[in-house]
A protein has these predicted regions:
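Extended amphipathic ligand-handling, pore-lining, and cofactor/metal-binding catalytic surfaces
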Residues: 1-253
Length: 253
């Protein structure tokens, strides 16, 4: 991304990544947003541009980050943070680049497994904000429109998990409830709306376990998880576009 936009890009997590041993990160310690910003503030930096590697407008970006900026601004009143749009912008419904990444990964999975007419379960983590699920559903609609129905008979957008309570029913259907339904009993490609591997999306992760458990109840089931989004070069083009959209935006207040 840095090469694409001609700037130095710092890979920074919002939370948690400092728990990972540097030994697993080529001996480069992970950094998280608040401590990174504070360190740069002490070095004299006052302006920051955040390009989110988030598919949709999560509470982390819309609520948590602005709250932390407000706290830091109490000590550093001239702190300025601008945030680019997320990877998928629902205000630009004609942008099919993210859907095309998913489609490329679907085709690669189909070729790898030799499937003839697989159904597609497009799965995300499952978020407590309906706007994030709207992104999932939007991508599902785009993928359905762009894939030939004669080769891919069904496309269903679903979530890996959801919170309890009717107020989170918008995350339905869950992946575990999709597998085994009509059209999802034989060849299935699980299209992974996940950026990178971890305890959910990695080998032996939660998504794989859901598929493995479903296969025990459906002996004809053949399934394959697609590669993850960060492994596709196209994500760099999208992030570069979002980066370019960042500077004109209003600073976080």
């Amino acid at each position: 991304l840095g090469k694409k936009v001609g700037e130095t890009i710092h890979p920074v997590s919002l939370l948690h990544s400092t728990k990972i041993s540097p030994n697993k990160l080529n001996d480069i310690p992970a950094e998280v947003f608040e401590s990174f910003v504070l360190k740069k503030l002490e070095d004299g930096v006052r302006r920051f541009h955040v390009t989110p590697m988030f598919f949709g407008p999560t509470a982390a970006i819309l609520e948590y980050m602005p709250q932390r900026v407000e706290v830091m601004r109490a000590t550093w009143p001239d702190l300025e943070v601008r945030i680019s749009p997320c990877v998928v912008d629902l205000d630009d419904p004609g942008d099919e680049r993210m859907a095309q990444i998913l489609i490329d990964q679907i085709h690669a999975s189909r070729e790898k497994c030799g499937f003839t007419s697989p159904s597609i379960a497009l799965v995300d983590h499952g978020a407590p904000r309906i706007k994030v699920t709207e992104v999932r559903n939007h991508l599902g609609e785009q993928v359905r429109r762009l894939l030939p129905e004669c080769e891919f008979p069904q496309v269903v957008a679903c979530s890996m998990e959801r919170r309890d309570g009717d107020e989170y029913a918008f995350n339905e259907p869950l992946l575990e409830r999709v597998i085994g339904t009509e059209g999802f009993r034989n060849e299935i490609i699980v299209s992974m709306l996940f950026a990178s591997p971890g305890r959910h999306a990695g080998p032996g992760g939660d998504v794989a376990k859901i598929c493995e458990e479903a296969a025990e109840s459906h002996p004809d089931l053949q399934w394959q998880m697609s590669e993850l989004v960060a492994g596709h070069d196209g994500i760099i083009d999208i992030l570069a576009h979002r980066f370019a959209e960042g500077p004109p935006s209003d600073p976080v207040s």
